[in-house]
């Protein structure tokens, strides 16, 4: 699962295409606002995840160097950010995990990277199949917001149980849990605590992954300090299983 980068290819037309897909959702029994989503996230994030260095990091500048554009992107992201954060909270997972799709794909469900990572969570085929996604032929559950989120959070739940540390869990999501276990064994550790001691021997981009999540946490805690006005008044229709606009076609046995 790779971080979003310039070589990321899109099977669609980016944010405009995602916005059009959201417009196609059928009316639901209720709506939510941006306030609902951002309060849910900021209230559940660990305050320690935002350090002074994270707030001033190059990743923060990269993500929010044009505040007006970032605000518009947040509006488009809202239905998906709502679903991901709600499901993470429902499972009792650290809310930092709900920020992973921003790092992976900028919350774009049709993102495809070289080497196989696909969808909102940039899931590899073997991982997706292991967690119940149908991948093959014209069907690929990684393009479904709801299906891919269920699979990714199931994997993250396993990582959280395995490492009991959200930073190590995020590194394992990026580098693979077997690599993280090997790193801990080399250090003579049986349990991770990335606040005190980072696992060694990992790729630079894996360590950067944690820095990116920390930067986004800082933004969620205090967006105004970065010149961004959250779209709190934006109203949207929550995603539902039968309105997922990017779900694969149902298998009718044909």
Predicted feature residues:
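Short, functionally critical alpha-helical segments immediately adjacent to catalytic or ligand/cofactor-binding
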Residues: 93-109, 169-174
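Low-complexity, Gly/Ser/Thr/Pro-rich intrinsically disordered linker/tail segments
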Residues: 225-254
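Catalytic and binding regions of secreted/periplasmic enzymes and modules that target cell-wall glycans
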Residues: 156-186
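An acidic, Gly/Ser/Thr/Pro-rich helix-cap/linker signature
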Residues: 19-92
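Bacterial N-terminal signal peptides
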Residues: 6-16
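Glycine-rich, acidic and aromatic/proline-enriched surface loops and short helix-turn segments
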Residues: 106, 120-133, 175-179, 219
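Catalytic cores of secreted or luminal carbohydrate-active enzymes
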Residues: 206-231
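Substrate-binding/active-site groove segments that recognize
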Residues: 115-137, 149-156
């Amino acid at each position: 699962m790779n971080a979003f980068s310039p070589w990321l290819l899109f099977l669609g037309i980016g944010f405009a295409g995602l916005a059009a897909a959201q417009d196609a959702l059928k009316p639901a029994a209720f709506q939510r606002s941006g306030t609902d989503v951002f309060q849910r996230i900021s209230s559940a994030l660990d305050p320690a995840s935002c350090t002074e260095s994270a707030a001033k990091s190059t990743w923060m500048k990269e993500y929010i160097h044009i505040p007006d554009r970032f605000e518009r992107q947040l509006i488009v992201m809202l239905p998906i950010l709502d679903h991901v954060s709600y499901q993470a909270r429902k499972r009792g997972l650290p809310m930092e995990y709900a920020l992973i799709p921003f790092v992976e794909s900028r919350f774009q469900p049709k993102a495809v990277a070289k080497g196989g990572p696909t969808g909102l969570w940039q899931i590899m085929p073997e991982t997706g199949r292991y967690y119940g996604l149908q991948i093959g032929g014209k069907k690929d559950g990684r393009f479904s917001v709801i299906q891919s989120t269920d699979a990714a959070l199931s994997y993250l739940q396993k990582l959280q149980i395995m490492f009991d540390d959200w930073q190590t869990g995020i590194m394992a999501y990026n580098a693979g849990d077997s690599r993280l276990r090997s790193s801990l064994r080399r250090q003579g550790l049986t349990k991770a605590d990335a606040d005190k001691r980072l696992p060694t021997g990992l790729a630079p981009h894996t360590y950067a992954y944690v820095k990116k999540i920390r930067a986004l946490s800082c933004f969620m805690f205090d967006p105004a300090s970065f010149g961004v006005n959250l779209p709190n008044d934006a109203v949207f229709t929550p995603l539902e299983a039968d309105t997922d606009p990017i779900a694969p076609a149902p298998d009718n046995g044909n």
